Amino acid sequence: MKIYSALLLAGTALFFTHPALATVCRNSNGTATDIFYDLSDVFTSGNNQPGQVVTLPEKSGWVGVNATCPAGTTVNYTYRSYVSELPVQSTEGNFKYLKLNDYLLGAMSITDSVAGVFYPPRNYILMGVDYNVSQQKPFGVQDSKLVFKLKVIRPFINMVTIPRQTMFTVYVTTSTGDALSTPVYTISYSGKVEVPQNCEVNAGQVVEFDFGDIGASLFSQAGAGNRPQGVTPQTKTIAIKCTNVAAQAYLSMRLEAEKASGQAMVSDNPDLGFVVANSNGTPLTPNNLSSKIPFHLDDNAAARVGIRAWPISVTGIKPAEGPFTARGYLRVDYD
């Protein structure tokens, strides 16, 4: 009898794969391209109304942006993300309206040659294939037909300057897990909005309050936020005359300041400031849309509004001696 010895070799097959390296792509020129919108000369007496939507002229052509992905990129598809720091206020017909400022909401649609129409903000949208992606060569970011809609939430009066601000920052990546760290292009806006509706405040003259000489030690004795002892608030009545604004309209006046701390306008001496209040002494908080003095126009589209003002210590520290001034602006809005 023969005995056979069998040797059983058992093994586990090992499969080695080469995973695609996730990468963050950049603008081929080295810096992000900015697509800019000028909001000047957009509004008229007809569309300067709450709820009105104004569509800006379409930027129908290609945005003209090329991107390049870094060494190690092995795929030929990309994702795009459209990020905004502005809050979404509402969605209407797929358009996501962002709060641009106290007067306007804004929304956009963008068309990609492969992905079609989409409505930012939105992250990691899968786009088409371009074989330059994996070869570290420039490829087109195929965005076009940019549609920008503006919605009025508060009508303008007089002139309002809209400082330049970024609406969307656009990133190109090769996976949905990549950090959104290197912008490829941005979409921004600014403008100077001037409308037929206007109100003249104090006949266009500066409203001045002069409190004379005040002892420096009185401010530190009063403490932060308080008026020095012996200083009396001053009262003035402001005449307002409106044009192209309906008689009997309900309006409001608020305070804007170059530098503010709480309820005070900070002066050119940082330890000192001024408080402006309504006729009853309730302070206005500078640069706060909800802090206002409501008033009612008469049959001649005019009104008279009382305000009070007084100096205060901002820090509670004894200030340096010398004159101090602060400048603010009285803005009239629809209430």
UniProtKB/Swiss-Prot annotation:
For whether the record's keyword set contains Signal, the answer is yes
Q: Which UniProt keywords apply?
A: Fimbrium, Signal
**Leader sequence segment:** 1-22
Q: Does the UniProt entry include the keyword Signal?
A: yes
- Gene Ontology biological process terms in this record: cell adhesion involved in single-species biofilm formation
Compartments where located: Fimbrium
* SUPFAM superfamilies per UniProt: Bacterial adhesins
Task: Tell me which InterPro entries the record gives.
Answer: Adhesion_dom_fimbrial, Adhesion_dom_fimbrial_sf, Adhesion_dom_sf, Bact_Fimbrial_Adh_Pro
Gene Ontology CC terms, in alphabetical order: pilus
Chief location: other
What family is this?
Answer: Belongs to the fimbrial protein family.
Task of the protein: Involved in regulation of length and mediation of adhesion of type 1 fimbriae (but not necessary for the production of fimbriae). A mannose-binding adhesin.
- Protein name as catalogued: Type 1 fimbrin D-mannose specific adhesin
What organism is recorded for this protein? Salmonella typhimurium (strain LT2 / SGSC1412 / ATCC 700720)
Name the gene that codes for it: fimH
